[in-house]
Swiss-Prot record:
Its main location: mitochondrion. This is ATP synthase protein 8. Keywords: ATP synthesis, CF(0), Hydrogen ion transport, Ion transport, Membrane, Mitochondrion, Transmembrane, Transmembrane helix, Transport. One of its GO terms (cellular component) is proton-transporting ATP synthase complex. InterPro entries: ATP8_metazoa. It is found in: Mitochondrion membrane. Disulfide bonds: none annotated. The gene is mt:ATPase8. GO terms for biological process: proton motive force-driven ATP synthesis. Belongs to the ATPase protein 8 family.
Length: 53
């Protein structure tokens, strides 16, 4: 069974690492969250508390 040179392991490591980083960046920056619309549809009562110590 042939053995791989250390430079081949390094190139594989860098390729998979860069692929992982690009995939995570794509998923992180392509997700759009509309918080204003979802908060306006829900009628949540907010209570203000004045704490006096």
């Amino acid at each position: 069974m042939p053995q791989m040179a250390p430079i081949s392991w390094l190139t594989l490591f860098f390729i998979f690492s860069i692929t992982l980083v690009i995939f995570n960046m794509k998923n992180y920056f392509c997700f759009f969250y509309n918080s204003n619309e979802s908060c306006q549809n829900l009628n949540i009562k907010q209570y203000k508390l004045n704490w006096k110590w």
